[in-house]
């Protein structure tokens, strides 16, 4: 075949395994672009065939003229391949390179929408092309590779059937109608939350899955009923606000922070921001702060897991009076801004100088561990005992945890500010965390030196998924979390924690001068002690209160077994329903089973709904961009290794990919991993803290980039320059 001089060709893969109705390998094989000669074409055909591996007679290649003058290119799927729901999912790139999307390159954007709803202007010409392709091939579920030229001409490169693992019942129209009914119920729920917040005087309607208490990280985006109920009762109903009110922030104890919408836990951003404003700030100024902070998040939704660091100040930091923060709150007059910062300064001094907090933390840990030690799990106990354990965890643990966590946030924020202003060396925060002798490092040390029985006596209550009853604890043989024969912890754990980093006299002098100019009533020695105490107390209180929660779930499992209910069924109960069962005192088994079935049906109807991580308006649920997150890079180290997941047989020397991880996933640090990447999480989330403790390179909160990185075989994390590179 002779190639004309006028236009280059492209050879695309068309292997038999790519286009079957039972599986799809789209994007797996090679495509070769820019072919101008017969020799190039011949070599490209051979190379593409070679990329298939073992050949079959049905394998082909596809030769096309290359599209010219491309403005936008990408892939559109006309349904969600995981659920079969009729979402249109468009992944596209505006660089003009037609291979970026299929090769998993950077810069790709994704827009998800329901048929019949509007799309961004650059994509509107794609809609009639989708309809035309579907009519031609006679299949609704298709994957279309396309380009749009600068003249708005849509070019279709390839069409494949989509392999769906979801439900295909009913006609296509029935499925669209069903999705719209579900989304209209979600829209009504959002409007209910908005009306409630309006009634509480909270301006703005932004919701998110990761601000503040990080529900997506701790219970996931589609939690079961019991996990969601426990999390809200223990943390997000009142504990969060009670702790902040004690420090001098605004009192929001009558306002829940987290709302279940479409089966997803969403944080009310207006409530969160309001709770970080000092109580002495006048109402008109507070309203401006809330509005400005939400405007910032709406403009940069990728900051949803960093709101305390980037969206609203929760303490006074050095050099805040001018620059970025002042510009961000432009609706405040200079006098209002000054008085707002003065109020933050008074509150910051109170938090840092409040040494009694750590005495109370030590007493609280002792009470929690004593209560846990008195628990004897046996079937003779009843549901009332379960509720009592949970209440002890709330009364003695979660409010205290919220207090020490807030103190640790303040410590971290000030330390990060000192690093940013080069008043302390880069990596100083990581060194402080390493020296705090917190729970993660202690667990790794204990695993290295203790016999299994002794280790499990200390840590056996920990559960990956603190609130999820279906997940085995460390001391449950079903879990098989630890390799006791081949122990491979990172480094050489010792009983003595790392020494605290030491500043030179000149550095201390500069920091103290900065503290004086900021208006702090404390010096460097007092702040350093506060920071180490806060970081250590946060982890120890978390460890202690989770013990009672874990024991309560095990007690519930024993009672459930006696009633003929398994853990799967129990996971669909809620605390109010368990309390109602206690009052009934008869026919518990039938009542609880009926409740579990009803809640499971509700969960099944919402668990495949695609909802945005940040909701600015109810209409967003019908069409939204999946924004590219700004991950937090922990430590300044570089590491490369095989991509691994928690279900892999061996994690040793791998870089672990995990969507979300609470304290129960600390077992992974006993498996000799070299690094970690999470989909959800922020600068101060659990895995960030653990990575700092252990000096482990980590990328926390990868968001939309998580999947493309996870699909690699070998990857490099360059944390100092905040870069992830796919090696192969």
Features from the language model and the residues they span:
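Structural motif
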Residues: 10, 62, 655-659, 676-677
């Amino acid at each position: 075949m002779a190639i004309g001089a006028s236009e280059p060709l492209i050879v695309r893969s068309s292997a038999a395994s790519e286009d079957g109705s039972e599986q799809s390998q789209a994007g797996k094989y090679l495509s070769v672009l820019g072919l101008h000669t017969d020799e190039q074409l011949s070599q490209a055909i051979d190379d593409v065939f070679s990329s298939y591996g073992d050949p079959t007679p049905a394998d082909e290649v596809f030769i096309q003229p290359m599209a010219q003058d491309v403005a936008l290119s990408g892939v559109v799927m006309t349904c969600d391949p995981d659920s079969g729901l009729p979402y249109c999912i468009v992944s596209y790139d505006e660089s003009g390179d037609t291979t970026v999307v299929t090769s998993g390159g950077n810069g790709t954007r994704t827009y998800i929408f329901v048929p019949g709803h509007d799309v961004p202007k650059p994509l509107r010409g794609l809609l009639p092309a989708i309809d035309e392709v579907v009519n031609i091939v006679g299949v609704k579920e298709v994957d279309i590779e396309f380009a749009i030229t600068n003249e708005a001409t849509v070019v279709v490169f390839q069409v494949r059937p989509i392999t769906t693992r979801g439900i295909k019942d009913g006609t296509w129209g029935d499925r669209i109608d069903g999705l719209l009914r579900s989304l209209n119920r979600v829209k009504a729920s959002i409007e209910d939350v908005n009306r409630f917040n309006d009634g509480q005087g909270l301006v703005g309607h932004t919701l998110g899955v990761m601000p503040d208490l990080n529900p997506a990280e701790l219970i996931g985006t589609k939690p079961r009923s019991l996990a969601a109920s426990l999390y809200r009762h223990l943390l997000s109903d009142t504990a969060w606000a009670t702790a902040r009110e004690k420090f001098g922030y605004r009192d929001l104890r009558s306002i829940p922070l987290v709302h279940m919408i479409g089966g997803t836990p969403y944080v009310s951003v207006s409530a969160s921001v309001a709770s970080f404003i000092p109580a002495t700030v006048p109402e008109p100024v507070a309203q401006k702060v809330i509005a400005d902070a939400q405007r910032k998040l709406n403009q940069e939704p990728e900051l949803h897991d960093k709101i305390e660091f980037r969206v609203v100040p929760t303490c006074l930091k050095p050099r805040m009076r001018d620059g970025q923060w002042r510009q961000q709150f432009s609706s405040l007059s200079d006098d209002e801004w000054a008085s707002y910062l003065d109020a933050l300064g008074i509150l910051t001094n109170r938090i840092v100088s409040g040494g009694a907090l750590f005495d109370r933390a030590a007493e609280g840990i002792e009470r929690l561990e004593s209560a846990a030690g008195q628990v004897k799990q046996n079937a003779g106990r009843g549901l009332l005992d379960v509720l009592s354990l949970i209440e002890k965890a709330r009364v003695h643990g979660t409010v205290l945890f919220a207090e020490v966590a807030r103190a640790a946030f303040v410590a971290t924020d000030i330390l990060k500010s000192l690093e940013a202003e080069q008043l302390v060396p880069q990596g100083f925060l990581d060194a402080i965390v390493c020296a705090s002798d917190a729970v993660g490092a202690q667990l790794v040390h204990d695993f290295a030196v203790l016999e299994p029985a002794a280790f499990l006596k200390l840590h056996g209550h920990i559960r990956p998924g603190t609130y999820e009853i279906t997940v085995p604890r460390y001391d449950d043989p079903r879990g098989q979390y630890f390799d006791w024969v081949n122990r491979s912890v990172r480094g050489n754990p010792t009983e003595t924690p790392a020494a605290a980093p030491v500043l030179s006299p000149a550095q201390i002098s500069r920091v103290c001068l900065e503290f004086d100019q900021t208006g702090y009533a404390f010096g460097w020695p007092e702040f350093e002690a506060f920071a180490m105490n806060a970081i250590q107390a946060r982890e120890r209180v978390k460890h202690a209160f989770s013990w009672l929660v874990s024991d309560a779930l095990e007690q519930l499992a024993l009672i459930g077994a006696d009633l003929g209910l398994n853990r799967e069924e129990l996971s669909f109960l809620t605390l109010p329903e368990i309390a109602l069962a206690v009052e009934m005192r008869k026919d518990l088994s039938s009542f609880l089973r009926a409740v579990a079935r009803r809640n499971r049906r509700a969960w099944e109807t919402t668990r495949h709904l695609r909802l945005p991580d940040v909701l600015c308006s109810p209409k967003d649920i019908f069409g939204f961009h999946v924004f590219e997150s700004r991950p937090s890079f922990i430590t300044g180290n570089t590491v490369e290794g095989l991509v691994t997941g928690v279900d892999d047989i061996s994690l040793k020397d791998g870089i672990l990919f995990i969507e979300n991880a609470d304290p129960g996933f600390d077992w992974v640090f006993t498996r000799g991993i070299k690094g970690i990447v999470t989909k959800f999480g922020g600068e101060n989330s659990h895995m960030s803290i653990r990575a700092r403790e252990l000096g482990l390179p980590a990328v926390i909160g990868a968001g939309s980039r998580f999947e493309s990185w996870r699909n690699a075989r070998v990857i490099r994390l360059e944390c100092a320059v905040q870069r992830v590179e796919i090696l192969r």
